[in-house]
Amino acid sequence: MIDEALFDAEEKMEKAVSVAREDMATIRTGRANPGMFSRIVIDYYGTHTPITQLASINVPEARMVVIKPYEANQLHAIETAIRNSDLGVNPTNDGTIIRVAVPQLTEERRRDLVKQAKHKGEEARVSVRNIRRKAMEELHRIRKDGEAGEDEVARAEKDLDKSTHQYVAQIDELVKHKEGELLEV
């Protein structure tokens, strides 16, 4: 029962770190990156579908992204979705592909993006701590119901704390890395 609670908590913490990693990938750094388009969706025959599933996305140069839709009739919809996104880029459509020039970030925009990265990191840390809290409640319930002894639960609590610190450190490292990318000129 204890192992089950710890395994469940660790699985959820891993998912929280994974979500944080995806969130960090969507923050534009001034360099072209296919991941910056992963959250943009378009209406594809009645279904909201990410652009990454409807087109190949290549980075031929440091500040240029080329998007080639698998179906030519989706070209305009993809272009419109990119233009309406919060990326701050202006796509150009040449009839077969979409080119997206990634502009240099201003100092003010860099600082805003660093704040955004720190905010997303804090959300992930809170998520990990909430998972820890729920797992601790489960461990206390196990102890109270007599399903496990004091020593076993105490050992499990130490393991849970160790895992929590490990995952929070991973999130901190993600934020630090993204901050370094953003402030690099």
From Swiss-Prot:
Protein's cellular compartments: Cytoplasm
GO molecular function, one term: ribosomal large subunit binding
One GO CC annotation: cytoplasm
InterPro entries: Ribosome_recyc_fac (IPR002661), Ribosome_recyc_fac_dom (IPR023584), RRF_sf (IPR036191)
Keywords: Cytoplasm, Protein biosynthesis
UniProt keyword Amino-acid biosynthesis present: no
Stretches assigned to coiled coil: none
A Pfam family that the UniProt record links to this protein: RRF
Superkingdom per UniProt: Bacteria
Region (Disordered): 143-163
GO BP annotations, alphabetical order: translational termination
NCBIfam families for the chain: frr (TIGR00496)
Family membership noted in the UniProt record: Belongs to the RRF family.
Function: Responsible for the release of ribosomes from messenger RNA at the termination of protein biosynthesis. May increase the efficiency of translation by recycling ribosomes from one round of translation to another.
Protein name listed in UniProt: Ribosome-recycling factor
Originating species: Mycobacterium marinum (strain ATCC BAA-535 / M)
